[in-house]
Structure formats: C-alpha cells, structure tokens
Amino acid sequence: MKNFKLNRVKYKNIMSVGQNGIDIQLDKVQKTLITGRNGGGKSTMLEAITFGLFGKPFRDVKKGQLINSTNKKELLVELWMEYDEKKYYIKRGQKPNVFEITVNGTRLNESASSKDFQAEFEQLIGMSYASFKQIVVLGTAGYTPFMGLSTPARRKLVEDLLEVGTLAEMDKLNKALIRELNSQNQVLDVKKDSIIQQIKIYNDNVERQKKLTGDNLTRLQNMYDDLAKEARTLKSEIEEANERLVNIVLDEDPTDAFNKIGQEAFLIKSKIDSYNKVINMYHEGGLCPTCLSQLSSGDKVVSKIKDKVSECTHSFEQLSTHRDNLKVLVDEYRDNIKTQQSLANDIRNKKQSLIAAVDKAKKVKAAIEKASSEFIDHADEIALLQEELDKIVKTKTNLVMEKYHRGILTDMLKDSGIKGAIIKKYIPLFNKQINHYLKIMEADYVFTLDEEFNETIKSRGREDFSYASFSEGEKARIDIALLFTWRDIASIVSGVSISTLILDEVFDGSFDAEGIKGVANIINSMKNTNVFIISHKDHDPQEYGQHLQMKKVGRFTVMV
C-alpha cells in the first residue's frame, strides 16, 4: 500500500512567524500537542503545510495575507514528505515567488505555467486541496465540515475520494469533443450547402442554356427545314418548267405568209369591187364616163367582167380559206411564244428565289452551328463538386456516428451512470464506517447517507433528525466520524495509507467529555499515524509524544 506521510516542515515570514523560522519534525512521534495562546501562532504550522503543498492558505484569506505583515517579504516554506516510496522536497515562497519540487534528489522541470505544475504535483502525491482539507485536517478555521458543504461539493469530494474524478474529466473531455463535433458539423453543413448551391447554379445554367439554345435551335432548324423545303419545291418547279419549255416546238413564223395572203386577198377583193362597180354601171345604163358610149347590161363586156368576177371570187375564197388556216397557225405560234416567255420568266424568277432560299439556308445553318458551339457544358465542374460533396457527406456521416457514440458515453458518464453505480456500491461502506466511529464516541443514533448525500438520522424511540437540528457537540461527533470515514475510504480506494492527521482546536469547541474521550480512543488506535492536536486548552503533556509550545516574542512567533 502506498503511504502519504509528512516528514518535516520548515517555515519563515509566514503569518506571525518572522525571519527566524520554525522547523518541526512531523514524523517523530505518534501524537504531538501544539499549544499556545490565542494569536500566538500555534496554527501557523497548518498554514505552512497547506501553502507548501498547494500554494493556498488553509483559512479563507488571500494568499498575499500569509506574508508576515512586519517583514512583508521572503515568505518561505520547505516541506519534506514521502509518497509511494518516493521522497519529495517542496520549496515554495512569496516575494520572491518560489516553487521547486525535488523527487528522490532530482528536481522536476516546471511546466509552462505554475497552475499546470501544481496540477501535475497533486497527481504525483495523490492528494487535492479539497481532499487534504477533509481527510488530513480537521479544524475550525478554513474548514467546512462535510455536512456544511453543498450537495455538488459533497459529491465532488466523494468522487475525488473514490477516484472517479477521472470520469468527470473524461466527461468534460467528451463534452468538449462533442462541442468540437458540433462545430465541425456546422462547418461541414456550411460547406455542403455552399457546394449544393454551386451545383444548383451550374445545373440551372445548363438547363437555361439548354432551354435558350434548344428554343433557338428549334426555331433555326424550323427555318432551315422550311427553306430547304422551299428550295426543293422551287427546284422541282424549275425542272418541270424546263421540261415544258423543252417540249414546246416552234415552226416557222406564219405571220408573214398570213399577212401576204391577206394583202393578196385584199387586192383580189378590190378587183372584185371594181368589177362589180363596172357591172353596176352597165346595169344602170347611161354613158360611159370615159368614152361616153351608151352602157347596156346586155353588153358582151358585162359577161366578160362577170367571168372575171367569178374568177376573182374563186381566188378570193381560196385565199380566205388559206388565210383562215394560217390564222390558226399564227394564233398557235403566238400562244407558244407567250408560253415560252412565261415559262422563261417563271424559271428565271424561281431560280432567283431558289438562290435566295439557298443563301438563307446557308446562313441559318451557320447560325445553328454557332449556337451549338456556344453551349457551355459544366459537366467537369459539377463532377468535381459532386466528388467533394460525397466526401463531405461521408465525413459528416462519420461525425454523426461518432457523436452518437459519444452521446452514449455521455449518458454513461452522468452522475446516474458509472459514477452513480460506483457511489451506490460504496454507500453501505460509508454508512458502516460513519456509525462505527459514532459508536466509539458513544452516539445514541444511527447516521445514514443516501446516494445524493442527504442525511437521515434515526434514534430509537425518537423521530428522525437532521444534521442542522443537533447541538454543536453532536455535530462535532458527526464531523469527526465523517473525517475518519473519508480517511478510511481514501485509503481503501487509492491503496494509500495517510500517515498524518492534524486536529486544529477540535478539542476546544463543543465536544463534551464523552466526545473528547471517544476521539482520543480513535486517535490512540491510529498506531501508524502522526497526529497533531492544536489547542489552547490545558492537556496532560504526558499523554503525548511531544509538546510544542508557540508563543509571541515581541511581534514574532517562536517555538519553545
């Protein structure tokens, strides 16, 4: 079993002790009595030991108030102790500040801060400031009895004794990690939302381009298709017109022959008219206007003229028939000419329209190709963002799982979890030891703590009590019983035997004779413990291994 033992303390310029320091061997005898008048400095040893171990006063005063008010400097405490078979030398002071620790002759390297160095030292010696004030020292100044502590403070003390404080540290660390996980999750959420938004922007842009380009391409393609159809139609119509034009065969123009026959017919008609005029003259009779001879219808000349008329009429009829035939040919010829001209004009116009349609189609085709080439595809960017998003989702999934597991750990580290189970296991032992010591001090009641460290006090034939309802003497019995119980529990749990006990003015308070006798019996049974009883009352020095007297000489305390 490990042993916590104070060997020696040397101090100066602390409280009422001046430059001429005090040196006390702490492991010399089993019981030491320290006496002196009020204000004589008999409790200064306790302040020196507390300051040496923890850098704090034992009483509720500021650290600077420990410095001797006359010299106002060079407070120095030197403390020798043993723990776990290692010898420690602690040197601590103020004005100037000093904090040195030597283990088995080797000085420890100081941490970055004195606070960290102090925490490291307390881990080395297995003792905290709160534990020290509950299991090593029982006093009236600077001491708050266990029952005077708040429920959280009671629990904290017991957790320290049961060494489940590590679970509290684990809980703090776990909660810090959960906060970090929450922070990382928030950062990932921001990144995820940002990437999703970027992907959406790219996709929207692609869709917008598809819509705009698609609508434009559709419009252009429709234009191109219409122009191509128009060109094909024009080409077909031109080919058809050419074929019709080729099929039109023009003979020799009959117009001249027609006109010539017309002239001939006109001349013959004129002759006929002249002949008929002469015949009429003969029929009418009278004198010839030329020869003045008598004209008669029976004249032979009339017969000859009629023959001429008949001859001319026959010729005229032949010419008229021929002329009518030529008229048909002339009309047909002219119709063919008109058709040729119309087809030629139509072909020319359609060729121009075809050329215009082809030119437009080429321009539209170029516009289609340009519109297609201007489409921006964000596939690569989207793929990279999606890959990053997948990584974030995977990381976030891992964080969520870790947070879930840490949530389970949080439940386990709650007061109702592992710590609660450990405390519940020790509660019966607490109550057994408390009542063991109360019995030694002849208490006529049973004191019980529950898992929330609320007390129940029962006495045969009387109603339940509370700690506050007791007299100061009975409270002192309970406080002493708890002190020795915590010492026992600390020893059982840690495997450390605490070989030092300091009782500061405990016997000067509300204890009655039976209570003092009971405490004395407990102390006398602690064979391997150095007990220091600080008191201003009269005691029998013969009952103690040594008697140290503190007294004021002038303004300073000395040991005599």
Curated annotation (Swiss-Prot):
Biological processes annotated in GO: degradation of host chromosome by virus; double-strand break repair; symbiont-mediated suppression of host gene expression
Disulfide feature: none
Protein's UniProt keywords contain Acyltransferase: no
Stored InterPro entries: P-loop_NTPase (IPR027417), Rad50/SbcC_AAA (IPR038729)
Matches recorded under Pfam families: AAA_23
GO molecular function: ATP binding; ATP hydrolysis activity; DNA binding; exonuclease activity
Residues reported to bind ATP: G36, R37, N38, G39, G40, G41, K42, S43
TM spans (from-to): none
Broad enzyme group: hydrolase
Enzyme Commission identifier(s): 3.1.11.-
Key words, A-Z: ATP-binding, Bacterial host gene expression shutoff by virus, Degradation of host chromosome by virus, DNA damage, DNA repair, DNA-binding, Exonuclease, Host gene expression shutoff by virus, Host-virus interaction, Hydrolase, Nuclease, Nucleotide-binding
Keyword DNA-binding annotated: yes
General function of this protein: Exonuclease that plays a role in viral genome replication, DNA recombination, and host DNA degradation.
Family according to the record: To phage T5 protein D13 and to yeast RAD52.
Self-association state and partner proteins as the record states: Consists of two subunits: gp46 and gp47.
Protein name: Exonuclease subunit 2
Name of the gene this protein is made from: 46
